Amino acid sequence: ITWIFDAVNYYGAGNALSGFITVLLIAYVSIYFGIFLVAIKFFKDHKYRVLIIPSVFFLLEWFKSWVISGFPWLNLGILSESLWGLLPIVGISGTSFLIILIIALLLEKNRVIISRITASLILAVLLIGPGHYQDGGDEKLKITVIQPLTTNMERIINMTNEAESDLVIWPEAVTKFDKTVSKLVPKKVVIGGFFRQENTNVYTSAINLKTGHHYDKRNLVPFGEFQPFGSLLKSINNFFNIPNSSLSRGSFYQTKADWSALICWELVFNETFTRRVRGTKYIV
């Protein structure tokens, strides 16, 4: 999470305050693991501890993924690719549950043989399950990615028109969306990150310039893109002078198309990822 330190420091907080805020964030994430350790001690002698303890871990990980706006770092289910055998079926938190269940079964002092056998079977499924054999298809696309540091619109448009690609991807939040932009890149499939206004709401959106279809970013960055506690922490925003810190969250249900997009750190949100990939041909 060093990017938190860099971002806050960039907006003028200084090394000391940026470090303090980063430490607070680390402490916040650590609370969930602390609660889990307390739960282990509390339920260690319970008759159904083998199921209760993994369930507590599952609930804590799920809660951490959505409180405020969610901070799904250090999710156990995605730490090792070799254990993704059931990931498409049970998801990240479900995989985390199964990993903790395996550990609980291996540490079980009663019914040792059945516990070891059950743990071995679950581990085998995680190691060789269907998640390791997903077919990505044979279709190939030629893609051009415009570097995020490129912010000059004239240069971006020239690079886009010169590209001989099936798809051109622009940086996130490169500019405010204007329909005239789409006329500058005719007959090209371009997916770009724009600030899109609808009534009084402003979204950061991925927009297909050829079709006009868009996806609005749902998982916003706390303090950077929205105020998690509204006017209560408005003074913090004024102190840091953070731009675009009052964006609106995209709808949970968004219109499907043959392509879908995940913007910035939406990639680490299991529920958002799962919903976006269903029924789509491409994910950007």
Where do the model's predicted regions map?
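Membrane-embedded alpha-helical bundles of multi-pass enzymes
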Residues: 1-132, 284
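Soluble catalytic domains of enzymes that build or remodel membrane lipids, polysaccharides, and related
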Residues: 131-284
